[in-house]
Amino acid sequence: MKVRASVKKMCEKCRVIRRHGRVMVICPNPKHKQRQG
């Protein structure tokens, strides 16, 4: 899980979602998981 100021899709399978007011990227590739913080 990467925590960064700007989250971007790293591949075409990445999905940008909002959870509890946080922007997150979920992806089958665990390296692409990100959270805005």
UniProtKB/Swiss-Prot annotation:
- The answer, when asked if Ribosomal protein is one of the entry's keywords, is yes
Q: Where are the transmembrane segments?
A: none
**GO molecular function annotations of the record:** structural constituent of ribosome
Its BP terms in the Gene Ontology are: translation
Signal peptide residue numbers:
none
Which keywords are on file for this protein? Ribonucleoprotein, Ribosomal protein
A Pfam family cross-referenced in the UniProt record is: Ribosomal_L36
GO cellular component terms, alphabetically, are: cytoplasm; ribonucleoprotein complex; ribosome
Superkingdom of origin: Bacteria
This chain belongs to which protein, by name? Large ribosomal subunit protein bL36
Name its species: Synechococcus sp. (strain CC9311)
- This chain is encoded by the gene named rpmJ
